[in-house]
UniProtKB/Swiss-Prot annotation:
Keywords: 4Fe-4S, Cytoplasm, Iron, Iron-sulfur, Metal-binding, Pyridine nucleotide biosynthesis, Transferase. The gene is nadA. It comes from Aquifex aeolicus (strain VF5). GO terms for molecular function: 4 iron, 4 sulfur cluster binding; metal ion binding; quinolinate synthetase A activity. This is Quinolinate synthase. Pfam families: NadA. GO terms for biological process: 'de novo' NAD biosynthetic process from L-aspartate.
Length: 322
C-alpha cells in the first residue's frame, strides 16, 4: 500500500495516511531525525512534525536541535536557513522543487548593485530570501520581528528587501527611518484584493479581521489585526469574537481549529485553487514525499561553505535581537 502511494502520488485513504504517518515517525526515531513543518503545510504533514511554526519559530528550532537529520517541510529558503544555522547537520527537503517566488525576485548581484547606490544604508532582508542574498545583507527579519528589530538599528536609512508589502507596513511603524523598498511580493498574499475583503466584511459584519503583512496595503487598511502567521494564530484563537476573517495562507485553518474549535474561521473561497492566498509550493510537499525522503535520506540541502558563513551572520544577528 505504501509503495503504491509513492509511485502514483494518488489521493490517500485515511487508513493509508495513518499507515504512512506511523512509518514516518518510526523512521524519524530510528534515524534520530527531527521533522519541522510550516503552518502552511498540508494537515497530514503537520501531524507528523515534531514542531509546527512560522519562519522565526522554525529558524530557532533548527538552530537548537540535537537531531542528526532535519527534515524540513517548507519551501526552499527555509531549508537553506536550517542548513545555514546547522551546517554540520544533514538537512533534507521533501520536494526540492518547492521554492518561493518572492525569494527569487531579487538576486545577490542586485543587492551588491544596491550597496553601491546606498553605501550608508543598513541592508535588511526578509527571511524569505535565498542563501546567496542573505550572504549580502546586514541582518534578516521575519514578519514577526521586523518592526522591533529595525527600530533597534543605528542606521537612519534602511534598504528593505524583497517584500514591498511588508516593507511598507514596517516603514509606517518606524517613521523615523528612511526606507528604500524592493518591489518583490508574495503572489498568494499580494493578489488578494481590497474588494474581496470588503465583500467578506459585508457578509460577516460581526467578524474580526486578521491580515498578514505580506498583503496589499489597501487590504491591511481593513484589518483589525496585522501580524505574522504565529501572531495571527494567537489573535484569532483568543479575540473576543465568534468569527474571524483570516487573510493568510489557508493551511493555518487546520491549526486554528485544533486550538480553538469553538470559533468560525473564515478564509476566502478562492483559496480552493492555486491562486489567492493558497501557496502551491508549500502544498507541493506531500506525506509520501516526506516518507521517501526520510527513508532514503535523499534531497539533501547543500550550500557552499563561504555562503553558509556569510549568511549565518545576519540570521544570528536577527535571533539575538528578536
Amino acid at each position: 500500500m505504501v509503495q503504491l502511494a509513492l509511485k502514483e502520488e494518488k489521493e490517500l485513504t485515511k487508513e493509508e495516511i495513518k499507515e504512512l504517518q506511523k512509518e514516518v515517525r518510526r523512521l524519524a526515531k530510528e534515524k534520530n531525525a527531527v521533522i519541522l513543518a510550516h503552518y502552511y503545510q498540508r494537515p497530514e504533514v503537520q501531524d507528523i512534525a515534531d514542531f509546527v511554526g512560522d519562519s522565526l519559530e522554525l529558524a530557532r528550532k533548527a538552530s537548537q536541535t540535537d537531531a542528526d537529520i532535519i527534515v524540513f517541510c517548507g519551501v526552499r529558503f527555509m531549508c537553506e536557513t536550517a542548513k545555514i544555522v546547522n551546517p554540520e547537520k544533514k538537512v533534507l527537503h521533501p520536494n526540492p522543487e518547492s521554492g518561493c517566488p518572492m525569494a527569487d525576485m531579487i538576486t545577490a548581484k542586485q543587492v551588491r548593485e544596491l550597496r553601491e547606490k546606498h553605501p550608508d544604508a543598513e541592508f535588511v532582508a526578509y527571511i524569505n530570501t535565498t542563501a546567496d542574498v542573505k550572504a549580502e545583507v546586514d541582518i534578516c527579519v521575519t514578519s514577526a520581528n521586523a518592526p522591533k528589530i529595525i527600530k533597534k538599528l543605528e542606521a537612519k536609512k534602511i534598504v528593505f528587501l524583497p517584500d514591498q508589502a511588508l516593507g511598507n507596513w514596517v516603514a509606517k511603524q518606524v517613521p523615523e527611518k528612511e526606507f528604500i523598498i524592493w518591489k518583490g511580493f508574495c503572489p498568494p498574499h499580494f493578489e488578494f484584493t481590497y474588494k474581496e475583503l470588503e465583500k467578506l466584511k459585508e457578509m460577516y459584519p460581526d467578524a474580526k479581521v486578521a491580515v498578514h503583512p505580506e498583503c496589499h496595503p489597501r487590504v491591511i487598511e481593513l484589518a483589525d489585526f496585522v501580524g505574522s502567521t504565529s501572531q495571527i494564530l494567537k489573535y484569532a484563537t483568543s479575540v473576543d469574537a465568534k468569527r474571524v476573517i483570516v487573510v493568510t495562507e489557508v493551511g493555518l485553518k487546520y491549526t486554528l481549529e485544533k486550538i480553538n474549535p469553538n470559533k468560525e474561521y473564515i478564509f476566502p473561497q478562492s483559496m480552493n485553487y492555486c491562486g489567492t492566498v493558497y501557496c502551491c509550493t508549500m502544498k507541493g510537499i506531500t506525506l509520501p514525499k516526506v516518507y521517501e525522503t526520510l527513508k532514503n535520506e535523499i534531497n539533501e540541502v547543500t550550500l557552499p561553505k563561504d555562503i553558509i558563513e556569510r549568511a549565518r551572520r545576519p540570521i544570528e544577528r536577527m535571533l539575538e535581537l528578536s
